[in-house]
Amino acid sequence: SYMPHYEQIVLRINPKEASQFDLVIVRGSRVYTSNRDRPMPQTPPPFAMVLRKYLKNARMTAVRQLGFDRVLALDFDTKFGAMHLYVEVFREGNIILVDDEGIIIQPLTHAKYSGRVLKKGVQYAPPPPANDPHDLDEAALSEIFAKSERDLVATLGGKANLGGTHANAVCELAKIAPNSAPGDVKVKLVHEALSSLLGSLANDAKGYLILDTEGDQTPEPVSYTHLRAHETG
């Protein structure tokens, strides 16, 4: 384990039948693999030393996502028993090493949020679970719409956790204007469009590179109808 700088952690992965690579974790931002050499500090930070102590020669057994949240759990089999490294990939997120009973061994930073505390020796509590669009039925959508003060596309993107691109795709499939008031739309049409989109993502996903009018590139898993004006084949 290395920390090139305070909010970046590098785990050296050595697969049995492949070349080694680095798993790079940037606090609150992203997780990716890399083969690039990085300058490392001569004196490892305390959190890096903790990771080395507990994860040295450990075997990674699983990588999991907690529900629909932007939280990854890296599971390890170590000489100390099962360990878990939780990576919170959202603004003000943390990186937390936890034992098999859920007790925090060490967080990257000690923090206190509404409803949870991240510090050594306490039970790890993930953030409150986000809405999973796969679990939203018509009744749940109706409740979300009734409480929303934003337009339809913003409500779907935020409260239903679809994000902007997928929220616009649902509006297009439902043939409803994105700026419609949620209370004025037929929930059944929105739910049918949402189910159709999620089905496409699960079963028909292909890679597309979509160019906007200024030439910027955005990778997407399916070809959305509201973006087809920019498709080049």
Where is each model-derived feature located?
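Extended, highly charged segments
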Residues: 1-228
